[in-house]
Amino acid sequence: MPSDSDDVAAVKQPWSQLIVDISNFLSEHPQSKTSQALLPSCNGVWSDEEKLELIEAFGHKKQSHLTKSGVKAVLAAFEGDRTQPDVIFLCRLLHLIFSHFSSENDRKKEKYIVKCDVIATLTRITRKRIIMTLDVTDESSIDHNLDEVLWKLLHKIGLKDPRVSLKVRMGGLISPMCKLFIQKDTLPELFLPFFIKISRSPRNGQAIGRYEGFMTRLLVKIKALDASDQTSQVLLLDKHLQLLFFTMKNKRTRTQLLRENICKYLLEVLRRHLASSSNSRPTRLLSSLFGTFDKSLSAAHTEVVIGTIAILRLLSNFKKARDELKNLQVLDICSRELKEFWSDEWKTGPKSRIVDSLSALCLRCMSPLPYPLETRRFPIDFPLPTATPSTPGGHGRIRNSSSINISFDNGRSSDEDGMDEEDEAFVRDDDDEGKDDRGSDDDDGKDDDEINGALPKTTRLNPQQLAKYAPFFVENEQGTLQPTFSMIYQTNQESWRSICEKTRHVMPIHHHLPIEMFNTPTRIREKTAKTSNNMKKMIIEELDKPERSATSNQVIYDLDTAAFDGLPSPELPFVTGGGKLDTSKDLQFDSRFESGNLRMVIQVAPTHYELFLSPDVNQLRDHYQWFFFQVSNMRKSVKYTFEIVNCLKSTSLYSQGMQPVMYSMMESANGWRRVGENVCYFRNLYINENEEKKNVEEQKKKKYYYSIRFNVTFQNTGDICYIAYHYPYTYSFLNSSLSMLKKRKQENVYCREDVIGHSLAGNPIKMLTITTPASAAEIAAREVIVLSARVHPGETNASWIMQGILENLLCRQSNEMYRLRESFIFKIVPMINPDGVTNGSHRCSLAGIDLNRMWDRPNEALHPEVFATKAIIQYLCEVANKKPFAYVDIHGHSKKWDYFVYGNNASESWRADDVLDVGAAQLEEELHLALPKALEATCPSRFNASECRFNITRAKESSARVNVWRQFGVSTAYTLESTFCGFHKGQNSGYQINTSDLKEIGRDLLHSFLEMTKT
């Protein structure tokens, strides 16, 4: 048997000779060394230089000095009649290459390996290997080392390949894996993690669950593992429970499990492992003193508890299982466990998730309530114009407006849900999968065009159509030496009232908002709210109450009936300071003002109010998130509970310390501030019965509703307060702000305001051109930066970032701002979707669709906002011959902290041809990293580089970021995303974001453009 020193000696041969030997082996040269002779080289100690040489030779593209090289040659060597030692060596070689990637340069090679479809090759080999293993009667003849290496490689590379689930299914590996699981008691170490990974795909999970004998065998293994109290066995039980969760989502499998009394058994598992994971403090202390307390075992029991509750929550979605759980006294079990928890031991980490999960399970098993608005049609709509014909030269065809909108409003944003609430129970803190997957894990439902790389059809304007945008680029011919003061003074003569009255609405308006609501700074820095035990408290309170009856509730506010009642005419009033109290009434509500959103309020207890949000006008898909309402007639020092009950997202930052904002008319000098105690976010009891019936017929997902619940104790009796999802920013305030900023601007700043189009309601879509006065020749030498914001009305943080950009560019005296204006021409569209903003929508324009899914084929009649903005960029690229230095579209993100960007990296595209199209030279330049690198250099305390993503999915082809990159070749096209909540890094860590922070992000972005010029 060779010693360790012999192995090292084998590796110490001239490294270049080893590379040549491997190359000869790949080319099957007659004199080449065998795989058995080369295998010891995989076990040595390598220097960084040697690792780099190995990666260059066999982990990337072909090298001209070698007979066979590059990862494609390694993959090709797998094909044909290879011996077991050959396959082991090739797998070890791939694993070594993939394991040694560390630097950013290596990450590019890692992505290249994934693009070369290693998973497809490994899938074929593994499939053959499983079939051979199952046919062998003599276990001793099986080389288990090969199996371990294969599964290790599949798991490692599978975590990096977003299409691994599809490739495994298409490669026919699922059935052999199911058969192996059924027949073998002992499996390779990474078999189960990989099996769980691919079962996350709904289609794969259903196929596995339906495989004959699989569920029966899975339950047998679970029960056998449950009998052991060894840490390794409990951890293995956790993995099997994960597999059970992902494979029981189809009706046939659930029915089979219910026949086998799965609910009763899982409750027994829950009780047993809860007891093991939550030993009382005295017991733990004694165990620790005598050295008998096993922390790792307790942690393993905790994971089993979390997984078991997730399965019970999934089962409770279905009436038969829910009824069975109620008969088994699940509510009593959960209530008892919640009350027995040590309150100071369950504030963070996995065990706090047990509290939240038990609370959610309680809610699932309570009697559902009918959704009060299920049969009501929203009374406010807007008649849409007829769609214009497709742009000449484009590939579209004329369709009616509704079909155009429906075809486009079908893609989720990065901010929308991608997984079920229960699925998140299995994304663990130490799970690489949760961190490394940049795109969707599943390609289910994709057609052949997507798999084969066919691009969606796009349109562009012809020269005649582009000509009408020439007036917005007069600086190219005339320079910017002419002052624009005449227009500015005319605009500034307008009062706040006249600006408000010029804004066009579809939603009814009862009063105007005071200008002080927007121009009072919010400099107070408030910490994120404590969330520990909020859900527990709420659930225990609910369990102690008598069962609710919908008939006992009182409707306090109903926009459907009050929409146009009592509206002042012709001149709308401004709200006054309050101070009055009508003792005959409880709280009063209203949302009939610009950007307001509240449809109905139901009083369910003396101080508990349920609030229902209005839909986006004409919406084709439901969007409920943005709220902004007035509340009055309150009593001082009374704790009121507000519950927004028709949210749709399964998770929210409201469960992580975020609070709503409130503006008090009696304390207006304080501006907006964060309010709300005991804030929690959870799935409530409302079910849309019409949706449920429709889903039975159409096999679609049921619609559930989620609540934001919080308590507010008002400081003044009879006050008038406004409560909102985030700091409001209206279209009227934008117009007033532009007027004031141009009046205050520096003398050496050129600022021109153009109206590039009108929204469906007739609101002007404005664009600002900002630079310094210069001749036409000097203007020709300047690069152009295009910025846009507020395509999604509910993302008010985007407007506050834009406010910071405008204040700095127009009014700030600093060397940096002077250099920016001297170096660049800024084309800024501060609010793309004024109609959505004005009418209190969350995501849509009056066309009822997400405008950020219309960039590939905007229709001039239906989507004039995007049509005009895209035309500006096309004019720059094709007429002015000035491809933008950068394009940044500013957004808000409701699930993430800090701020970050999304860009476009061709090597991470859903379309394999993109890598070939852009060419190796451009990939090497890494232009897509220019802005994030600059932001990290200029503002590391707020910018979170780890949240940046550069993948390109098919669903995002119609977004601004991807379309500007693809159609116009702007490599530096980005989406900037900012949190609604707060910061997780730097000196701001633990604090909620305010408008001053958001303005500073705008300044950060401007500084980063200067940083980009250095590279």
From Swiss-Prot:
Its cofactor is Zn(2+). Disruption phenotype: RNAi-mediated knockdown at the L1 or L4 larval stages causes a defect in egg-laying without affecting uterine and vulva muscle function. It is found in: Perikaryon; Cell projection, Cilium; Cell projection, Dendrite. In hermaphrodites and males, expressed in amphid and IL2 ciliated sensory neurons. In males, expressed in CEM head neurons, RnB and HOB tail neurons, and in gubernacular erector and retractor muscles. It holds the Pfam family Peptidase_M14. This is Cytosolic carboxypeptidase 1. Changing G596R: In my22; abnormal accumulation of pkd-2 and klp-6 in cilia and dendrites of male CEM, HOB and RnB neurons. Age-dependent defects in cilia structure associated with impaired osmolarity responses. Binds 1 zinc ion per subunit. The lineage of its organism: Eukaryota, Metazoa, Ecdysozoa, Nematoda, Chromadorea. Residues 727-1013 form the Peptidase M14 domain. It comes from Caenorhabditis elegans. The gene is ccpp-1.
